[in-house]
Amino acid sequence: MNPRQFIIAIALGLALAAGTCLALRMQIPSEPKFALVLPEPNPVPEFSLLNQRGMPIDQTVFAGQWDLVFFGFTHCPDICPTTLQVLAAAKTTLQEKGQVPLPRIVLVSVDPERDTPELMQQYVDYFGEGNLGITGALDEITRLTSGLGIFFAKHLSDGEDYAVDHSAAVLVINPDGGFEALFSGPHVVENYVHDLPIVMGGN
C-alpha cells in the first residue's frame, strides 16, 4: 500500500467510526423523557410483610433486580389493572427488543384487609410470570408507603364494598434496594420502553 492509499484508508476508517458513533447516539437516547430520576437513590425503608405465597419478606426482597413497584389493590376497578397491563406490555416489548436486565413487576396492596396472599397471587399472576405481590399488616404497609412518599386512604363504609384512594405512581427500585426513579403518569407502554433502558443502564 502506497502512502496515498494508506491516507485514504485511514480517512475512510475515521469516517466509518464517526458514522457508527452518530448512529448509536441516535438510536440510544441519553436521558429519560418521562421518568423523574432522583438525584440520589433513596433506600427502601425497613418493613415486615408477606409475599403472595404467604412467606415473610422484608426490604431485602428488593435486592438483586430492578423492580417496578405499584401500590394498589385487587378490588380496584380501573387504575390498578390498567397500570399493571401497561407494565406487563412494556416488559414484553423490552424482552422482544433484547433488553437485559428486565424489571420485575411488584404490586403492594393498600387494602390488606381484603387482599390475602392467595388473592394477591391470583391477581399478580394474571399479568404475567415472575411478578411479586406484597400484603400484610396495615401498619407495616403504612411504614413502607410513608417512607416512599406514597399516599393512600380508605373510603369510610359500613359494608365490604369500599374503595381506596391511592397514589398512581410507579416507582423504579434499583438492585441495591434504592428508590431510583418515578413514573407519575400517564402510564403509556412507549414511555416505559423508551425510558427504562436508560434508567436501568445508568445505575
Regions found by a protein language model. Give the residues of each.
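Thiol-/selenol-based redox modules, centered on thioredoxin-like
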Residues: D158-N203
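Thiol-based oxidoreductase modules, predominantly thioredoxin-like and allied folds used
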Residues: V100-D115, G130-D139
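N-terminal targeting signals for export/organelle localization
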Residues: M1-E46, G202-N203
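Short, acidic, Ser/Thr-enriched surface-loop or helix-capping motifs
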Residues: N51-Q52, N174
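Generic structural signal for well-ordered beta-strand positions
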Residues: I57-D58, E180
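Short, internal strand/loop/helix patches
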Residues: Q121-S167
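Short active-site neighborhood of thiol/selenol oxidoreductases, capturing the structured segment around
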Residues: Q59-T83, L87
